[in-house]
């Protein structure tokens, strides 16, 4: 059968006839077992299918599968090649770290030549030294930021919390630009709450005692009341003027200026006003002695009933 098919195929080729199975005969001559040269529908379908899906050698399929497997292996290896290999960590010795830290304390931004010198001293590469300085600067900046944050957080004590409150929280009873309508009286101020003074246990009005002068004039009045008993020859107009000054000043000062003790310090020592008062009394006594020595103690001044201002105006120039 196979010999007959081969003879028929050779004859058809010589005559120029190309049957439907010629391609199969030329491609795989030894494997053809049955050849149909009829024009039956079955043969036509088989010829069409053979053109669309030509037969392949089973060894070729195995070769193709092997090539596909190799391509897959190459594709699997490509991402690993593209993936950046992890660099090994550099383990510094204590001597190297000591040298690097000493240089960092002197210069935080060394140039290329300095880095090369450090690399020679520490037996490292310039790239390793550059990376170490970069990481060390980042650590230093982070520590500086943390220290500044701690200072800002703990810089103000609790006694200053009252000063940090808003205006509305400190003075809830007062509206904007309404001071004239309510009036700034001592009663209105005493009823308001001041967080800063409350935290320090201080009355707001008691702060006036820290800035108000002492009752030097009242002490002057007490000392001046003793002058007539000691001085006899002094003109009466000056004594009357002192008494008038005491009568005018002492009630107003005693009613206006409170005298609570300062909570921060012991009672203050006498002011200079008392010293001047004592010096004036000493001068008055000295003048009295001079008048008594010259015999003017019995002389009466005709203008003794005048006030201090009238006496100053009527004096002859």
UniProtKB/Swiss-Prot annotation:
Major localization class: nucleus
Protein's cellular compartments: Nucleus; Cytoplasm
DNA-binding region: 85-144
Tissue expression from the record: Expressed in pituitary gland, brain, heart, kidney, eye, lung, testis, tongue, spinal cord and skeletal muscle.
UniProt keyword Phosphoprotein present: yes
Modified-residue entries (Phosphothreonine), positions: 90
Region annotation Disordered: where it falls in the sequence: 35-99
Similarity comment: Belongs to the paired homeobox family. Bicoid subfamily.
Assembly and interaction partners: Interacts with EFEMP2. Interacts (when unphosphorylated on Thr-90) with ELAVL1/HUR.
Entry function: May play a role in myoblast differentiation. When unphosphorylated, associates with an ELAVL1-containing complex, which stabilizes cyclin mRNA and ensuring cell proliferation. Phosphorylation by AKT2 impairs this association, leading to CCND1 mRNA destabilization and progression towards differentiation.
Name the UniProt record assigns to this protein: Pituitary homeobox 2
Organism: Mus musculus (Mouse)
Encoding gene, per UniProt annotation: Pitx2
